[in-house]
């Protein structure tokens, strides 16, 4: 049995489906493919919910074998864990109420912008707009609720995550261009190069045989349009 850390609070990417009580999403498609490649049966996996802040610790303490949880590959994180090649290229944008006049992160100087603890957006937001007041939350749903209740002026994180929040609340809208590059990778504890290489092989096959495009179209296509080309294989450890 494979144990995989996933998000359960990120619509379209990794979320708990209330109808099935199963965790689903774009990230989960990669976990299923890896599990199927190992065992011949995609059900032989235990999906363990993790928060953004718990992704790396859960690998380091052996709670999970891998993490596929909208996790950006960064130099600092690569010092702590190993990563697969890039399986999705995201970028930070901004989510605001539909009647708001903000058009970019730069318009939010002096305003309150929510993001999740342990996310790369914590650093990216001040870098893009230094006068923003960053408000931290444990989950993106908490950020969305704060926006709905007027406690913050915007939510900022990866574009695909914001697309999922906008799906939940059609009275919100995404604005502005991406102001960061967020290459997603699957995390593995240090010291398992063969496992990383195996995961890379599965990702590469998905990119070449159409499964990557099918996963993108299934989860993001209605909100983000046709699938782009899969990202090239980079960020080897």
Region spans (language model):
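Extended ligand-binding regions for polar small-molecule ligands
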Residues: 28-29, 36-38, 119, 186-224
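A ligand-binding cleft/hinge motif common to bilobed small-molecule-binding domains
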Residues: 54, 70-79, 124-127, 141, ...
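Periplasmic-binding protein-like
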Residues: 88-96, 159, 163-203, 222-237
């Amino acid at each position: 049995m494979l144990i995989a850390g996933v998000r359960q609070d990120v619509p379209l990417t990794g979320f708990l489906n209330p109808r099935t009580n199963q965790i689903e999403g774009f990230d989960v498609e990669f976990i299923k493919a890896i599990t199927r490649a190992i065992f011949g049966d995609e059900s032989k996996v235990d999906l363990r919910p993790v928060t953004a802040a718990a992704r790396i610790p859960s690998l380091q303490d052996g709670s999970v074998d891998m993490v596929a949880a909208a996790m950006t590959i960064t130099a600092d994180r690569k010092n702590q864990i190993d990563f697969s090649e890039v399986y999705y290229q995201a970028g930070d944008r901004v989510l605001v109420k539909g009647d708001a006049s903000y058009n970019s992160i730069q318009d939010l100087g002096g305003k309150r912008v929510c993001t999740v603890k342990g996310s790369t957006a914590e650093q990216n937001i001040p870098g893009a707009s230094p006068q923003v007041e960053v408000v931290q939350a444990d989950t993106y749903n908490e950020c969305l609720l704060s926006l709905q209740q007027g406690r913050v002026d915007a939510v900022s994180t990866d574009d695909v995550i914001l697309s999922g929040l906008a799906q939940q609340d059609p009275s919100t809208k995404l604005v502005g261009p991406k102001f960061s590059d967020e290459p997603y990778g699957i995390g593995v504890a240090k010291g398992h190069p063969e496992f990383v290489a195996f995961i890379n092989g599965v990702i590469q096959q998905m990119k070449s045989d159409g499964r990557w495009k099918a996963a993108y179209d299934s989860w993001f296509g209605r909100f983000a349009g046709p699938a782009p080309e899969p990202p090239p294989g980079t960020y080897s450890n």
